[in-house]
Amino acid sequence: FPRFDAGLEKFDGTPLYEVQDPAMAVHPMWGTMLYNYVSPMVKDFLISNAFFWLDEFHVDGFRMDDVDAMLYLDFGREAGQWTANLYSSNENLQAMEFLKHLNSIVKKQYPGILLIAQEDGLWPQLTDSVENDHLGFDYKWSGGWTKDLLSYLEAEPLDRRNYYDQLTLSMMYAYSEHYVLTLGKRDVGTLKEFLEKLPGSSRQKDAQLRAAYGYLMLHPGVKMTAPDGDVGPEMRAYLHDLNELYRNHPALYAMDGNSDGFEWIQFTSYDENVVAFLRKAEKP
C-alpha cells in the first residue's frame, strides 16, 4: 500500500498494518509498504475490503497485481536485504496462506466470481485448487504472451523472421495454467498508440491490428479486450465479428485447458512468417 500521511503506514504510531520488521516493510522497487499477513486483524481487513466490493458494487471478479511480490520474500531484493522463512527458503508462507484463505472464502460465498493473478515469477500451479494445496486462482494473466506478440509486431517486416519464435513460444506453456490473454489499454495503450508502434503505411498498420486481435481470439486461453473510444466503425465491426465467431465455434474455447484441443499445422515458417493450427472441440 502507498506511503502518505493519511494512509495506513504507522496508522496508530506503530507498524499496525505493515510488516513488523523495518527491513522488510518497504518494497525496494516501488517504495510501497507490505501488508503483515501474519496479523489476523490485517487479514480480516483485506478480506473485508474484498467483500465490500462484492456486496456493494457487485464486481465480477478481482485481478491481483504483482502477486509474485507477495509470494517471494526476495522479490526485487538483493542478497542481504531479505530474511528467509523458517525452512530457509524464499517463499512468503503467510502470504501463501492468506491467498488460499481469501480465494476459498470468496469462492464459497460467490462461486461465479473470477479470481485472476498477475504474476511473472513462474510460481507453479497458481490456478490449481486450494483443495490440492495450491492458491486457487481461476486464471493467470498472461503478460508473457502479450509481450512476445508485441515484440514481433513492432519489428520491421523484413526482420520478423528473427522474432518468429515469439509467436509460437506461448504454446510451450499454454496448458501449465489457465490463462487470460489480453490486448487491452493497460497492455498496448490506446488503439492510436498501438497503431503508432506498428511499422508500415496506415493501411498496413490497420491490417496488422486486425491480425493481432484475430490471433488473440484464435489462440488457446480466455480473452480480454478493452479497446478505447478511438475504435472506428470498421474496427468495431471487425471486433464484433470476431466475438461472434468465437461464440459460435466451440472449438475456440471448449478445450482451452486440454492440449488435445490444439494441433500445430505450421510453426517453422520463418521466412514466410506464417503460423497455422487447428482448434478442436470435443467429439459429440
Map each language-model feature to its residues.
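Residues that form generic nucleotide/phosphate-binding pockets
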Residues: 152, 238-241, 245
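Substrate-binding/active-site clefts of carbohydrate-active enzymes
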Residues: 1-90
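A short, structured beta-strand-centered segment in the mid-to-C-terminal lobe
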Residues: 36, 40-43, 230-241
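Glycine-centered small-residue hotspots that permit tight backbone geometry or close packing
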Residues: 13, 227-228
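Conserved alpha/beta catalytic core and glycan-binding cleft of carbohydrate-active enzymes
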Residues: 58-60, 75-227, 233, 247-283
